[in-house]
Amino acid sequence: MSSLPTVLVIGAGLAGSEAAWQIAQAGVPVRLIEMRPIKQSPAHYSSEFAELVCSNSFGALSSDRAAGLLKEELRRLGSIVIRTADSHAVPAGGALAVNRASFSASLTKELSAHPLITIERHEQEHLPGEGQITVLATGPLTSELLAENLRTFTGRSECHFFDAASPIIEGESIDLTLAFRASRYDKGDADYMNCPMDKGQYLAFREALLNAEQAELKEFDKESAKFFEGCLPIEELARRGEDTMRYGPLKPIGLWDPRWGDLNDRDVRRSKRAYAVVQLRKEDHEGRLWNLVGFQTNLKWSEQKRVLKMIPGLHQAEFVRFGVMHRNTFLEAPQLLEPTLQFSKRSNLLAAGQITGTEGYTAAVAGGWLAGSNAARLAMGLNTITLPSTTMIGALTHFVSDSDCFRDRKGEFQPMPANFGLLPELAERIHAKRERYGAYRDRALTMLEEAQQQWGMSKAPVQIGSS
């Protein structure tokens, strides 16, 4: 029986799962509270931990990409979520995509079996007392009662935007006489299903999107409805201009069906090249289920079925999940948090994940790792830590705790995904982009290793595919 105080983690999403694991692995007991299935959120379907409600992709794998560097840092820090994602990966070209069902089930099983983690299934309606070390990892779908209590505690109204999830269809219902398998620019294996459109099909599809009936927003949301630019509903993209979708998720560049002829023949290429292409990505290794890439939507389910069947190759599509839209809540973190992810006004309360204003699955995991590590250190009477801003984890946590950080044109704090623009400039200017990103990576991993040595953190690189 541990003599250390028990840490409370509220929320068993990506950030909360990571935080709970890091705390327990440090030898500190944890109470992990998850309200599902006692109370479901508007977007979740199961009671499993770390359920992925939007895409099944964690983004780029290559460490010379910002999202890939973030994952590599987390592997070296012993992240359970990234380890599990690697173990449940499905083919996705240069991205880390997972079988979302087996991924969540595996995490739930491992966390539930840990001797220092106690699972509690109920809604946490308020913040615990001041003596309790707590990690708040309730995510963008924080329950209203807790959100109201948080507003009272911070003295601020929370920020929000609207997020949406893409539909999923059965692979057997895709017409392979019209669709073809390929990865963009032939990178990796042919891991994506591609549905090409000519100009007439594209314009008719866009017109159908513009005229389709949307699901009704709650009255209090209608006037303040705004979207995160990195995850716009497909109908919102259609509204922004005739070619917006073609330069976004439906871009045809780098995709070629061998049945069209010789790609190297200029005349064939000009006459056969698709005007737009809808891509689908595997949900599972066998390809039984596929999600429509970039097709977040708030259309009514009946309208999704009608409009999306206009896509060539999907005229007989069988839907296993329709797209949904939900309100995402996040804190005005730069006014509330320290770079350690502790609240400025209460040092034993920490926040992690998308509620802090980071964007993306891997960034949520990174916040969970840091908040969990610091909660464990508080329980052990040690100083809390930060990671250097030259690392991607450090850059993200400094971003959400910097009162001078980037704001939109209205002066409002907005979520930010991992990107190299967050990192300090290199000592020497490198003009070639690939070499520059490689230099950012090399510096980040060197600084991470130095930080691990400074703070006595064990080096824990994780082999991809290990369990």
UniProtKB/Swiss-Prot annotation:
Keywords: Cytoplasm, FAD, Flavoprotein, Methyltransferase, NAD, NADP, Transferase, tRNA processing. It is found in: Cytoplasm. FAD binds at G11, A12, G13, L14, A15, G16. GO terms for cellular component: cytosol. Its main location: cytoplasm. Its cofactor is FAD. Disulfide bonds: none annotated. The keyword Isomerase does not apply. It catalyses: uridine(54) in tRNA + (6R)-5,10-methylene-5,6,7,8-tetrahydrofolate + NADH + H(+) = 5-methyluridine(54) in tRNA + (6S)-5,6,7,8-tetrahydrofolate + NAD(+); uridine(54) in tRNA + (6R)-5,10-methylene-5,6,7,8-tetrahydrofolate + NADPH + H(+) = 5-methyluridine(54) in tRNA + (6S)-5,6,7,8-tetrahydrofolate + NADP(+). One of its GO terms (biological process) is tRNA wobble uridine modification. Gene3D superfamilies: FAD/NAD(P)-binding domain (3.50.50.60). InterPro entries: FAD/NAD-bd_sf (IPR036188), MnmG-rel (IPR002218), MnmG_N (IPR040131), TrmFO (IPR004417). GO terms for molecular function: flavin adenine dinucleotide binding; tRNA (uracil(54)-C5)-methyltransferase activity, 5,10-methylenetetrahydrofolate-dependent. Its EC number is 2.1.1.74. Belongs to the MnmG family. TrmFO subfamily. Catalyzes the folate-dependent formation of 5-methyl-uridine at position 54 (M-5-U54) in all tRNAs. This is Methylenetetrahydrofolate--tRNA-(uracil-5-)-methyltransferase TrmFO. The lineage of its organism: Bacteria, Bacillati, Cyanobacteriota, Cyanophyceae, Synechococcales. The gene is trmFO.
